[in-house]
Swiss-Prot record:
InterPro entries, sorted: F-box_dom (IPR001810)
Protein name: Uncharacterized F-box protein C05B5.5
Cystine connections: none
Pfam short name (any one): F-box
Domain F-box span(s) in chain numbering: 12-60
CDD domains reported in the protein's UniProt record: F-box_SF
Keywords from the UniProt entry: Ubl conjugation pathway
Regions crossing the membrane: none
Tagged with keyword Cytoplasm: no
Length: 337
């Protein structure tokens, strides 16, 4: 008959007092989610885990949107651990509450509710940074909304300050007045000043002027070594056809390699005679084989202009509307080499 270890003052096993060699052996049988849960049992166990970090993080994704707060760790063995704090908008009686999901190979799905989801998000993120090896990790994707300005500055300074980011997206879907636009661009500048090198930057704002309403999206591509600080021109501009003509001429003359994609969609048609005035273009067909981004118009879509560039050419696609129906695209090629 086997013997059983009962939990008494004399016989209980104190995990913390075990030698580090035993700790490391135990950790070999635990996955990241189990390590995370174990770290929350006591401060002493948390310290033990800090001294024996087993899992190295390869990529980190962060999202601080209006309705979702999320961080995701991808480890060197391709295991993914993610936490999501999101607004349960599909259940009206939970509108002000958030749920979190922590997943390890889709095996775990836990739900809790928090009065302060931002504090819960920060607590979980700080804890994950401390117990896993993030020294050589990359910040792969970072999605930010200007309304989360205070949350951004509460992120661990040692993690954010000077850290390189491969893909940074900042958007504001409510920038429909001058104050909102000013706030959004100042937020973008504040983020870029704290970050290190940003490889790809995507800025998206809904804008309106006296004569027009439009979505504005601009994407930059940066080198590995330079700071990326875009100007304010695209945000404060009303983007009539003359402005777009000036933009294209400036790009052709100065060959700014940072601008890779520029798209606006407005509740109007674009006059290509004005937009391309003084610019030599070649009619282009996507079947000619250039690998570029294409935007598919829908029946309810508005007019749009897409500028897509690389080092030696650019393509401009102008979409037209006829009532509520899309009339398709005209495509123009600029050869710059």
């Amino acid at each position: 008959m086997g013997q059983y270890l009962t939990k008494t003052e004399e016989s209980s096993l104190n995990y913390v007092d075990l030698p580090d060699t035993v700790h490391r052996k135990i950790f070999e049988y635990l996955n990241p989610w189990e390590i995370f849960k174990l770290s929350r049992i006591s401060k002493a166990i948390h310290v033990t885990i800090l001294k024996n970090k087993k899992f190295a993080v390869k990529d980190i994704d962060l999202c601080t949107d209006e309705n979702i707060l999320k961080f995701q760790f991808q480890f060197v063995n391709n295991i993914v651990l993610s936490w999501e704090f999101y607004n349960l908008h599909e259940k009206p009686y939970f509108t002000s509450q958030f749920s979190n999901r922590c997943q390890y190979r889709q095996q775990y799905d836990i739900k809790n509710y928090y009065e302060n989801p931002e504090e819960a998000f920060l607590f979980a993120f700080r804890n994950a940074l401390s117990i896993f090896n993030v020294q050589n990790s990359k910040l792969k994707r970072f999605y930010l909304a200007p309304s989360k300005l205070e949350l951004f500055f509460k992120l661990p300074y040692s993690f954010i300050d000077g850290r390189n980011c491969e893909n940074l997206s900042i958007w504001n879907k409510k920038a429909n007045d001058e104050d909102e636009r000013d706030f959004s661009i100042n937020f973008a500048k504040a983020v870029l000043e704290k970050m290190g090198v940003v490889r790809n930057l995507r800025l998206l704002f809904n804008c309106s002027t006296k004569d027009n309403e439009f979505d504005c999206e601009k994407e930059y591509y940066n080198s590995e070594t330079d700071k990326l600080m875009p100007n304010d021109w695209y945000l404060y501009n009303k983007f009539d056809d003359i402005d777009l003509n000036v933009f294209l001429k400036n790009w052709l003359n100065f060959r700014d390699p940072l601008i890779r994609k520029f798209r606006i969609r407005g509740k109007r048609n674009f006059n290509t005679a004005i937009i391309f005035d003084g610019i030599e273009t070649i009619p282009w067909d996507q079947r000619n084989g250039l690998n570029v981004y294409y935007y598919s118009a829908t029946a309810n879509d508005t007019g749009s202009l897409i500028f897509q560039a690389n080092e030696n050419h650019a393509i401009v696609k102008v979409g037209a509307i006829n009532g509520n129906e899309s009339s398709g695209y005209m495509e123009f090629l600029f050869i710059t080499f």
